């Protein structure tokens, strides 16, 4: 595979101790200390009240990161192709459905069943934005962020149109947590453009690599990177926060990983 090249027009990030890209950028550049805290999400005011009442953390997280990336770029969310990438989707919802099925009353809530499909966030996004552009939902276990980045990049390059990547993960409650130990919710949004614009803050050149993934210097951030699939993005986000030129390797399938050259 030859290198793929796109430009980053917008960034969104909500995770533990990083409520939005502005605060996250300060943490990632060392201007502010990283303090572990539960992710704080804004209300999803773009959804009608009935839908707003039905959504859980996963959809709120996807909405928050997507809208922040679009705002950062000054882009119209209603016009953007999207890629939603999540290793487990709505884990709380999955837990509740399984709990119901294990009980004497096995009647699953229609709303919970509706929200259990992997592309539910894409559906709520279309309701919130009125977007009728193409949307893809995928997962790839621990390689989910890299798989989403590749998919969004290929779509941007092949269509000649911007593509918004929304990668997010949430935590399973026990007993499922014992089998899939994602400790915190985290979401990342990247608006990728095949053309350099006034909104572009960096350019990415992406290609396969046999090199090992770039670790985070901060032990607490490295712990997040290793334990949350969406946090495999942190070395790239840190490079973007610092500005200038540099390269990182992010986890993909191990052989290969993805090498990313970042330039202004």
What are the roles of these predicted feature ranges?
Residues 62-67, 72, 137-163:
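Active-site-proximal alpha-helical scaffold in enzymes
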Residues 1-112, 117-134, 167-264:
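Conserved "HGTGT" condensation-loop signature of ketosynthase/thiolase-family condensing enzymes
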